[in-house]
C-alpha cells in the first residue's frame, strides 16, 4: 500500500511533484529560500511549501511564523515568474477561509479574509501597471458556518476576537499537549491558559 495515500492528499501531490515534475520539465523547489530565488529564467517551476500544517496545507495566517510566506508572497512570486510578453493565467485560492468557517473560528476567519485581500492587492498592483490587458476575478464557491452581515444590531463583541492569538486548531493541540504533561489541570490554571492564548478574562 502506498503510504503517501494514507498520510493524506498533500503527500500524494508532493510525491507526484518529486517523481513527475522533473520528468515533465519542471524545476521543483523544497524550501522557501529556494522559492525566493526562483526567477522567470527558471522556466516551469513547482514551489513546495516547507511549512505545511494539518492536512498538508499552509498555516493559518494567524499561526504563521515571522518570515513565513503568506498567500500574497506566492501571488507576487507567481507574477514575477509568469509575467511575459504573451500573457498568463493565475489562480489563487484562499482555501483556509473555508476551513476556519468549518471550525466556527471567527477570529481566524477574519485573519484569513485579510490574508486573501492582501493577495488580491498584489494582483491589483499588477493590474494598475497593465489595466487594458488584465482581468481580476474574485469569487467564492460556497459559504460555510453561517457567516453573514445584516443591518440589525449584533450582540457579538468583535473587539474581543482581536485578542485571540492562535487558531482553534493550534489551541486544541496546545490543550492536548498540556494534558499530556499534566493529567489534572485545575480551573484557575486553565483560565490563565485561556487568557494567554485567547484573551479571556482572568
Which stretches of residues belong to each language-model region?
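Active-site His/acidic residue clusters
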Residues: 52-65, 83-87, 91-119
Amino acid at each position: 500500500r502506498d503510504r503517501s495515500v494514507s498520510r493524506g492528499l498533500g503527500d500524494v501531490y508532493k510525491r507526484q511533484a518529486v517523481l513527475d515534475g522533473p520528468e515533465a520539465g519542471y524545476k521543483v523547489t523544497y524550501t522557501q529560500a529556494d522559492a525566493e530565488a526562483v526567477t522567470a529564467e527558471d522556466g516551469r517551476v513547482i514551489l513546495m511549501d516547507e511549512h505545511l500544517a494539518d492536512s498538508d496545507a499552509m498555516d493559518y495566517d494567524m499561526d504563521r511564523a515571522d518570515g513565513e510566506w503568506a498567500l500574497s508572497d506566492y501571488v507576487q512570486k507567481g507574477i514575477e515568474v509568469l509575467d511575459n510578453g504573451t500573457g498568463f493565467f493565475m489562480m489563487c485560492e484562499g482555501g483556509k477561509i473555508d476551513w476556519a468557517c468549518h471550525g466556527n473560528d471567527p477570529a481566524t476567519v477574519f485573519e484569513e479574509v485579510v490574508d486573501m485581500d492582501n493577495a488580491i492587492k498584489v494582483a491589483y498592483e499588477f493590474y494598475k501597471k497593465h489595466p487594458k490587458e488584465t482581468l481580476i476575478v474574485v469569487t467564492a464557491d460556497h459559504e460555510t458556518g453561517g457567516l453573514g452581515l445584516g443591518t440589525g444590531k449584533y450582540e457579538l463583541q468583535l473587539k474581543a476576537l482581536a485578542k485571540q492569538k492562535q487558531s482553534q486548531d493550534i489551541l486544541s493541540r496546545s490543550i492536548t499537549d498540556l494534558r499530556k504533561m499534566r493529567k489534572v489541570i485545575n480551573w484557575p490554571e486553565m483560565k490563565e491558559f485561556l487568557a494567554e492564548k485567547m484573551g479571556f478574562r482572568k
